[in-house]
Amino acid sequence: MSKEVLTKSKEKMDKAEQALTRQLGTIRAGRANASLLDRLSVDYYGAPTPVNQMASISVPEARMLLITPYDKTVLGEIEKAILKSDLGLTPNNDGSVLRLSIPQLTEERRKELVKEVKKEAEEAKVAVRNIRREANEELKKLEKNGDITEDDLRSYGEDVQKLTDESIKNIDNITKDKEAEILEV
């Protein structure tokens, strides 16, 4: 039973790390990346639809995204959504595809993005700490019910702390890599 608590906690912490990686992938780092448009939705027949489900997104060059909608009638809607978004990009519409040129980031914009990365990382760390708290509470319940001894509680508590430390270290590494990518000129 207590091993299950550790296994579940490890899985949840891994998911928190993966969620952070996905979230950081949507932050522009001066290079073209199709995941930049992951959070972008377009009103399509009355329903908000993610752009990546309405169009093929490719990266023909290091600083260029090419958006080819499956239905050409939504080209204008996708263009409007990009202009309204906080991406700071201006699409070039040639009637059948949209080209997004990714400009060099200014020093000021880089610093803003690093702050955003740190905020996302802190949220991931809070999630991991909450998972640790839940695991410790579950272990205390097991000890109270007599399923594990006090020594087992202490031992498993240390294991949960090791998992937490490892997960936070991974989050720090993910964050450091993304910051380096953003600050790279």
Curated annotation (Swiss-Prot):
Keywords from the UniProt entry: Cytoplasm, Protein biosynthesis
Gene Ontology biological process terms, A to Z: translational termination
GO CC terms in record: cytoplasm
CDD domains registered for this protein in UniProt: RRF
The keyword Amino-acid biosynthesis is assigned to this record: no
Primary location: cytoplasm
Subcellular location: Cytoplasm
GO MF, any single term: ribosomal large subunit binding
PANTHER family noted in UniProt: MITOCHONDRIAL RIBOSOME RECYCLING FACTOR PSEUDO 1, RIBOSOME RECYCLING FACTOR
Entry similarity comment: Belongs to the RRF family.
Annotated HAMAP family: RRF
Function: Responsible for the release of ribosomes from messenger RNA at the termination of protein biosynthesis. May increase the efficiency of translation by recycling ribosomes from one round of translation to another.
The name this protein goes by in its record: Ribosome-recycling factor
Species assigned in the record: Listeria welshimeri serovar 6b (strain ATCC 35897 / DSM 20650 / CCUG 15529 / CIP 8149 / NCTC 11857 / SLCC 5334 / V8)
Name of the encoding gene: frr
